[in-house]
């Protein structure tokens, strides 16, 4: 019986061939060249896969095959007007079926021609846009890989985001490969920072919160050290911080005593319902901070404890001894990157802790390899599944249905409510959480003869308050 001939399953190769043979390939390439010139003229900043690819090109590497059609994702401090302007330019140059529509991600506008997407423009507040680090590749500004890391960590922090193509299925492998390339070609230098500590004691709920920030680092470091002792591995010599902690617990609360940097003595907790937790703990709000892009959620500050809100999200968590809930190492890495971006005066401190957390994961990986060689596959799988140092799908779930509905879903529901002209019942769990879609950007189609929408206001829509601004809370 004859066998079938071997087939070359080079997917990228055939994708390139398919692109070149599309009926409108010439028009698409011409439209993309218009987009490229627009990006350069407006000094917009590329991000996402194309920015990673271009940054790697500067180092002699890449993630995309040579000649692949560019997928232009860009940041703009005025993305709505820029998207409308780009649509007008394409239409005036004779391209057909030009349109600008609001994307599923509410802060993004998509531009298409002939039903092919040629540009995604995402909003970045001016205070961030004007200060983030960039590189230049062929006259195009691209976001620096240090900043790009944050977006890669994000998928690991919220594994069930973006249904029905949840990140755990659609992004984990791809983002891990991209992260490793960034770490290889653009490592963040280890610059030791002398830090003075003070011992702080906090009492927090046992079940509703995950320990975060510098306290989470202390817990993960000591958990690593206990694993080293269990494995009878020699003690490591390191310049990274080695804070200690102790605790005792009852059915409801944990009393935690932990070494905290004197410059940042407040405990940081992640919770899906910060206002209720603050009320239950008898604390008083002093300040509320808006999100910092997608990289830091709303923060509710009290005198000694800061609460990171994960409402409408399912945050990946780790469990350490006695089932103490700690954020995953990936969320901790994201926290330290956010700190470096948002507080330039202490950038070196946060990046030092970022590298320290990477070191913890590196050492944990070496210990897990040691355990794997000494145990059966079944025993190792059980052990690894409970390790706080591996990627996980264990999440801090909200007991209320409303806590797992994304902004995109709520906007879609608000659209349905508007079209039906029937309000949601007041008893509906989302009745108080529907956005005012009348303040969102409008779609625009230059060829339909209607005037371009004007006067979009970022200030009037809470969904665009993502610059990290903090406002004192009036009692």
UniProtKB/Swiss-Prot annotation:
<keyword id="KW-0808">Transferase</keyword>
<keyword id="KW-0946">Virion</keyword>
<dbReference type="Pfam" id="PF19244">
    <property type="entry name" value="Poly_A_pol_cat"/>
</dbReference>
<comment type="function">
    <text>Polymerase that creates the 3'-poly(A) tail of mRNA's.</text>
</comment>
<keyword id="KW-0067">ATP-binding</keyword>
<keyword id="KW-0507">mRNA processing</keyword>
<comment type="similarity">
    <text>Belongs to the poxviridae poly(A) polymerase catalytic subunit family. Highly divergent.</text>
</comment>
<dbReference type="InterPro" id="IPR045355">
    <property type="entry name" value="PolyA_pol_cat_su"/>
</dbReference>
<dbReference type="GO" id="GO:0044423">
    <property type="term" value="C:virion component"/>
</dbReference>
<dbReference type="GO" id="GO:0005524">
    <property type="term" value="F:ATP binding"/>
</dbReference>
<keyword id="KW-0426">Late protein</keyword>
<protein>
    <recommendedName>
        <fullName>Putative poly(A) polymerase catalytic subunit</fullName>
        <ecNumber>2.7.7.19</ecNumber>
    </recommendedName>
</protein>
<dbReference type="GO" id="GO:0006397">
    <property type="term" value="P:mRNA processing"/>
</dbReference>
<dbReference type="GO" id="GO:1990817">
    <property type="term" value="F:poly(A) RNA polymerase activity"/>
</dbReference>
<keyword id="KW-0547">Nucleotide-binding</keyword>
<keyword id="KW-0804">Transcription</keyword>
